[in-house]
Structures are given as C-alpha cells and as structure tokens.
C-alpha cells in the first residue's frame, strides 16, 4: 500500500472536542497507563464508563492492537451494560484489529485530540486512582503473574463495589448502578470470567 493512502484513511476518524456528558451507561473512555519500575515496563489498559464510573484495568507487556482486543473482550464480560461508544486516544494500538472488532460489534469509535487530557478526564482520574491506591502500594515487580492478577482483580472489585466516589454522591459504581438502573446484585459481582 502506498504511503499516502495510509494517511488518507486516517482522516475518516471521528474526533471529539469535549469530554462526554452521558447520563446513560455505555459510553466508554479508554486509555493506556505506562508504568516502568526497575527497567520493567507494563502497559495498563484502562476503561471507564462515563455515566456509572465503572472501571476496569488489565496489564500487558506490549502495547499492541491484539492486546487491546483482548482487553476489550475482558471488559465486555465484566461490564453490566451494552457498550454503545468507545472513546480513545490516537495511539497505534487503537487502530487495525481493534477498529475492525468494534465495527463487527456495531460500536462507534471516537478519538480524542493529542495532549488534551481534559477530554479523557474520567479515565485519567481512574488512572491516577489506580496508580496511587494500587500500583504505588503493590508495585509491578511481583514474581508470579497469578499473584499480581489476583491483587489487581481484588482491587478492581474493591473500587467498583466499595470505594465511594464524589462524582456519584459518595456511592461506589456498583451501588450507583443498583440504585439507578435496578439491576440484581448477582449479575454485578461475577469476576470469574476475567481469567484468561
């Protein structure tokens, strides 16, 4: 494929100028948090629902399109609503296989402008919370991957079920979902599908 054709396809991206103000669940903002410790780099793929602040994170050793497809599949299993829109930055991992996967599922993909963290404010706040409350406490250099996975899943369950958020009137995301969207307790706490 000639070089100029590759760039003309990129012009068809839907760009957003403002942070979404959704009141119904299903608008997801995603980002990648890069953490390096003692020469080891991990890429934490994070996603947050705008309306409910439901958050999910998982880490990979590489920032590839296949890894974000895997992350997306994991997120779909634990997110209790249908995904309608997926907002992300212009990173190379958000193109290719991932774009095709979103099209197959009928999900609109929108891109934020570079160097505009206010557009991704919800996921940037989640990244900060993940870094301060989990990564700074546990680090990323745990010997066994299964041990780290268990700690991360435990923290995600805590974040979504017990941690109070000011943006939700001091309720956790799952409490907010139960009150506002009348869902059963059983469907919200099943995390066994997160395992690879």
Feature map (PLM): residue ranges:
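Short small-residue beta-strand/loop micro-motif enriched in glycine and branched aliphatics
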Residues: 53-58, 110-112, 136
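Active-site beta-loop-alpha junctions of metal-dependent nucleic acid enzymes
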Residues: 40, 57-81
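Mobile-element integrase/transposase regions
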Residues: 1-46, 54, 70
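Short, conserved catalytic/metal-binding motifs centered on acidic residues
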Residues: 31, 53, 89, 120, ...
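Anionic group-transfer/hydrolysis microenvironments
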Residues: 33, 48-51, 91, 162
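RNase H-like two-metal-ion nuclease catalytic core shared by retroviral integrases
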Residues: 88-103, 109-133, 143-149, 153, ...
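Acidic/histidine-rich, metal-coordinating catalytic segments
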Residues: 63, 81-95, 169-172
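C-terminal domain-tail junction helix/linker
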Residues: 5-6, 10-19, 105, 132-196
């Amino acid at each position: 494929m000639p070089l100029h054709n590759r760039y003309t396809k990129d012009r068809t991206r839907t760009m957003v100028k403002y942070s979404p103000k959704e009141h119904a669940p299903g608008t997801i903002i995603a980002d990648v948090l890069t953490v390096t410790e003692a020469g080891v780099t991990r890429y934490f793929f994070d996603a947050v629902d705008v309306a409910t602040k439901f958050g999910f994170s998982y880490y990979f050793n590489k920032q590839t399109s296949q890894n974000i497809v895997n992350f997306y599949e994991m997120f779909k299993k634990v997110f209790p609503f249908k995904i309608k829109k997926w907002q992300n930055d212009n990173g190379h991992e958000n193109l290719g296989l991932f774009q095709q996967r979103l099209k197959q599922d009928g999900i609109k993909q929108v891109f934020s402008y570079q160097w505009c963290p206010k557009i991704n404010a919800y996921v940037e706040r989640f990244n900060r919370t993940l870094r301060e409350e989990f990564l700074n406490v546990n680090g990323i250099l745990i010997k066994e991957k299964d041990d780290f996975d268990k700690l991360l899943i435990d923290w995600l369950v805590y974040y979504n079920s017990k941690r109070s958020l000011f943006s939700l009137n001091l309720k956790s995301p799952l409490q907010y979902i139960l009150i506002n969207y009348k869902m059963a307790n059983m469907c919200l706490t099943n995390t066994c599908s997160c395992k690879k």
